[in-house]
Structure formats: structure tokens, C-alpha cells
A protein has these predicted regions:
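Class I SAM-dependent methyltransferase "Motif I" SAM/SAH-binding loop
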Residues: 54-58
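Short conserved loop adjoining the S-adenosyl-L-methionine
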Residues: 107-112
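A short SAM/SAH-binding and catalytic strip from SAM-dependent methyltransferases
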Residues: 117-129
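A short glycine-rich, Lys/Arg-flanked "PGG" loop and its adjoining helix->strand segment in the class I
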Residues: 132-143
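Conserved beta-strand signature within the Rossmann-like core of class I S-adenosyl-L-methionine
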Residues: 142-151
Length: 216
């Protein structure tokens, strides 16, 4: 579904204010929660290339670079994060180490090269076409795909419906999604990736690592 998402709708929620809040939280606490869990699931990243889709201020990219990744690429649909992302890299001595791009990853997938590791942290729940998003992410992962997505639970689906009613009443075109987990994994499997680990984080999130046969 190329071009299915209006960046204006994303900028309303993922704004400069939210970027500043994320940077402030990182400065105070460092990497926490599901972000930290995903970095742990990455394992040994020495010398690898990383593609982070929807990574916001780039905290996971920074963590993987500090862990030994050779280079990183970011694709973020909201341009409101760019200034704070550059600040974060500069503060830790990594200015110029991340190739940052603004755009819809699915629509722009043909212009983006494959990477060893691809990251989708809390991105699946923000995109309507899960098959296209996860499929392109898997196709771009030479070695490993890391994801965090909502668990398959009834109360999460109910909560998502409530959130979307509120967004509609607020005249915001953005919607959130609770895609079936098996559909997420199937989209990756269609491109040759199989689950290595799946870990639940509290009552909401699940993180997973999926690898390509013979790549590790």
C-alpha cells in the first residue's frame, strides 16, 4: 500500500513536543523497557549494519552503534524528530554516523538498501498495512529482524478501538492497530525469516527476533 499514510497525521501525534519529551526521558533514564529488551535480543552486533524504521529520536540506533554496529540508517515518517535525533547523536559523539531519512518506509522501500539488522520498535501498531510493512522489513533484513508489537489480547483490541474513536472525534486521520501476531510472523516468514525468541513485556507488548537461515 505505497503512500497509504499521510505524514501530516503522523506529525500531529509524533510531534516536536513528543520528540523533546523522548529526548528528556532518555537523558534522565537511558534506554529502558521494550527498547532495552529489543537491544538485548539483537545479541552480538559487532560490525553489522542497522536499519531502524520509525525509530523516533534514534535511541535504539545509538545503543546498537555503542554496542559495535558499523553503521545505521533511520527511516522516520515524521520529520519532527530530526532535530532531537541529531542532538542525541552529538551528545554521545556519533554525529554523522546515522544516515537519517524522512519518509514512508513502505513507499520508499525500493530506494533503501538491505541491512544486516532491521528494527521495528512499536511501529507495527502504527501502520495499516501490516503485510507490506513487515514484508518489506523482512526483505531488507539480511540477518535479523527485531520487532515490538501489541500482544494478541482482547483488552488490547478493545483499547485500540477506543483510541481510534477518540482520534476520529479529534479529527485526526492517524489510527492505531492491533494486528494479529500470527499475521505479523507470517509476513516475515514469507521472506524467509523464522522466530528465534519471543518475549512479553508486561500486559501490553511483545518483542521478537527473527533470523534468516544460515545467517548467524
Amino acid at each position: 500500500m505505497p503512500g497509504c499514510c499521510d505524514p501530516i497525521d503522523y506529525r500531529r501525534l509524533f510531534s516536536r513536543k513528543s520528540a523533546a519529551r523522548d529526548l528528556r526521558r532518555y537523558r534522565e533514564h537511558g534506554l529502558t523497557g521494550t527498547s532495552l529488551e529489543l537491544v538485548k535480543l539483537a545479541g552480538d552486533v559487532h560490525g553489522v549494519s542497522v536499519l531502524d524504521v520509525g525509530g523516533g529520536i534514534g535511541a535504539i540506533e545509538l545503543a546498537l552503534l555503542r554496542a559495535g554496529a558499523a553503521r545505521a540508517t533511520s527511516v522516520e515518517i515524521s520529520d519532527e524528530y530530526e532535530e532531537e535525533a541529531e542532538k542525541l547523536l552529538a551528545e554521545h559523539g556519533y554525529s554523522g554516523c546515522v544516515d537519517r531519512n524522512v519518509g514512508d518506509f513502505v513507499a520508499d522501500a525500493g530506494t533503501i538498501e538491505e541491512h544486516d539488522v532491521v528494527v521495528l520498535h512499536r511501529v507495527v501498531c502504527c501502520y495499516p498495512d501490516v503485510d507490506a510493512l513487515v514484508g518489506e522489513a523482512a526483505a531488507h533484513a539480511r540477518r535479523l529482524l527485531l520487532l515490538t508489537y501489541p500482544q494478541d489480547r482482547w483488552y488490547i483490541r478493545s483499547g485500540v478501538r477506543g483510541i481510534n474513536v477518540f482520534l476520529a472525534l479529534s479529527r485526526c486521520g492517524f489510527r492505531t492497530y492491533a494486528h494479529p501476531v500470527e499475521r505479523i510472523l507470517a509476513a516475515a516468514a514469507a521472506h524467509g525469516l523464522t522466530p528465534v525468541a519471543r518475549k512479553r513485556h508486561g500486559a501490553l507488548w511483545e518483542s521478537a527476533s527473527l533470523s534468516r537461515a544460515g545467517s548467524r
